[in-house]
Amino acid sequence: MEQLGKKYEFTEETIEVSERTLHRIKAIRDFGYVKAGELGGFIEKEENLSHEGNCWVYNVAKVYGDAEVCGDAKVHGNAEISMRSDYIVFKNWWSSGRYFTWTRSNNMWKVGCFYGTGEELIQKAYKDSEISGREYERVVRYVESILADEKKRE
């Protein structure tokens, strides 16, 4: 895979959030739907937004602390992300290519217009197709294993 180097830089514009200084970002090359020169949202440090993939922080969205935006994730609007494990975004690689999200705070899944538990997601997916059911089940079980590992460490 070709390394394209940095994709954004900090501008002079800063804001203060939770006693942290966040910097407005600006794209320095084209990637995904972002064009060179486009202003983005605010991040505290480069570790908050990967230079790889098509991930981007838009508008007035804020990312800071231990949070990291990577892959093809997009943070929009007034979103404010400050912890690494607030939620996990996955991509449906087996059919539609759309993104879906698991949220830690309520242990719920959001896929298109579906919103529910992991078990409800698996049941719905198997009704759609054997492949979808199997793949969604795999992802749900992966998240469950992360949670089980965290409980062991407590």
Regions found by a protein language model. Name each.
Residues 50-84:
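A detector of tandem-repeat and repeat-rich interaction/domain scaffolds
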Residues 148, 152-154:
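Acidic/polar low-complexity scaffolding segments in large eukaryotic proteins
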Residues 1-60, 64:
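Extended, small-residue-rich solenoid/repeat segments and analogous flexible loops
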Residues 36-39, 56-57, 123-125, 135, ...:
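General "foldedness" signal
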Residues 55-64, 135-147:
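Short, compact, well-ordered microdomains
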Residues 71-145:
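Glycine-rich hexapeptide-repeat left-handed beta-helix
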